[in-house]
Amino acid sequence: MRIILLGPPGAGKGTQAVGIVEKYNIPHISTGDIFRKNIKEGTELGKKAKEYMDQGLLVPDELTVGLVTDRISQEDCKNGFMLDGFPRNVAQGEHLDIFLKNAGISLDKVVNIEVDKSILVSRAVGRRICKSCGATYHVEFNPPKVEGVCDVCQGELYQRADDNEETVSKRIQVYLDETKPLVDYYSKQGIIADIKGDQAIDKVFEDIVAALGSGK
C-alpha cells in the first residue's frame, strides 16, 4: 500500500498517520524526519539541505525530491509506505510520479483530510502543551482535569507562540496556495479519497480504512 496523506495544519494528520502505519504495517515517511536524519548523519543531500535551512530558506523541490526518493528506495519501503508532508506542491508531485513510473510502481491512494478553516483555527488556538512531557490538550475538546496542569505529570501547560489566530490563518493560506492544487492533480488520476476531518477521531480513521480497503 503506497499512500500520500494530505490535509491542512490542524487537520489531525499526525493522529491518523499513527493508525494508518500500524494497520497497514508500512513506514511513515515525513519530510521533516528525513531532513533531520540526513543533516545529523552528514550526508551530501543533508549538507545541501542544511545550507538552505540555516538561511531560513525553503529547501528547493529538486533537493527535497532527491531526499524522499532516496528514502522510498530503501528495503523497508518495498511493500509500501505513507508519505506525510510530501509532495507539498504539484511540481513535487510530478517529480514523484516520474520516479515511481521509472521504478515500475504507482500510488494506491491519496488521503485528503478536509476540515473547515474556522475549525482549524479553533483547534490550534485552543491547543495547550505540557512543558515537561509534551502531552497535548485542548481547552475545549480535550481539557486537562485541572486547568493549566498536565494530567500525566502535573507539569505546567503552555500555549505555543505561533498558535495564535493570525499565524495559524497564514499557515492555512500557505497550504491552500501551495498544496491544495495537489488535490485536483490527484483527482484527475482517480486516486484521491476525500475524508471529513471534523468528525470524531475514530470515525475519521474508520472512513480512511474504508477508502483504503484491505491493502496489498
UniProtKB/Swiss-Prot annotation:
EC number per UniProt: 2.7.4.3
Annotated region (NMP), positions in chain: 30-59
Key word Membrane present: no
Top-level taxon of origin: Bacteria
GO molecular function, one term: ATP binding
Record's signal peptide: none
UniProt catalytic activity: AMP + ATP = 2 ADP
Pathway: Purine metabolism; AMP biosynthesis via salvage pathway; AMP from ADP: step 1/1
Family matches, as Pfam families: ADK, ADK_lid
Sites where the protein binds AMP: T31, R36, L57, L58, V59, G85, F86, P87, R88, Q92, R160, R171
GO cellular component terms, semicolon-separated: cytoplasm
Binding site for ATP: G10, A11, G12, K13, G14, T15, R127, T136, Y137, Q199
Example of a GO biological process term: AMP salvage
Subcellular location, record wording: Cytoplasm
Family note: Belongs to the adenylate kinase family.
Function: Catalyzes the reversible transfer of the terminal phosphate group between ATP and AMP. Plays an important role in cellular energy homeostasis and in adenine nucleotide metabolism.
Protein name per its UniProtKB record: Adenylate kinase
UniProt source species: Clostridioides difficile (strain 630)
